A protein has these predicted regions:
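A short, Lys/Arg-rich alpha-helix, primarily the initiator
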Residues: 1-18, 56
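Generic recognition of short, well-ordered alpha-helical segments
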Residues: 7, 49-50
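Short alpha-helical DNA-recognition segment
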Residues: 20-38
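DNA major-groove recognition helix of helix-turn-helix/homeodomain DNA-binding modules
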Residues: 50-68
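Helix-turn-helix/homeodomain-like alpha-helical modules used for DNA recognition
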Residues: 72-74
Length: 74
């Protein structure tokens, strides 16, 4: 897994900004609820390992399509 849980809030917001997605849009793309994405961004919950894998697979697809560039520190 290449997403570090402690960098997650920064990471998930950066993904949404670059892809011009709302929390609801991102939730739909990765198969979770809006409330889940909202809780992640507000530091109420960290994603499960399964959710992290879903996010990584989605981000990998977007990177391959040239739609997403991530900072090296992630």
């Amino acid at each position: 897994m290449w997403i570090k849980r402690y960098d997650f809030v920064f990471f998930i917001k950066e993904v949404r900004v670059q892809l011009d997605l709302s929390q609801e849009d991102l939730a739909r793309e990765i198969g979770v609820s809006f409330a889940t994405v909202n809780r992640w961004e507000n530091r109420r919950f960290l994603p499960s390992k399964m959710a992290l894998r879903q996010i990584e697979m989605y981000c990998d697809r977007m990177i391959k399509l040239g739609r997403l560039l991530l900072p090296d520190k992630l």
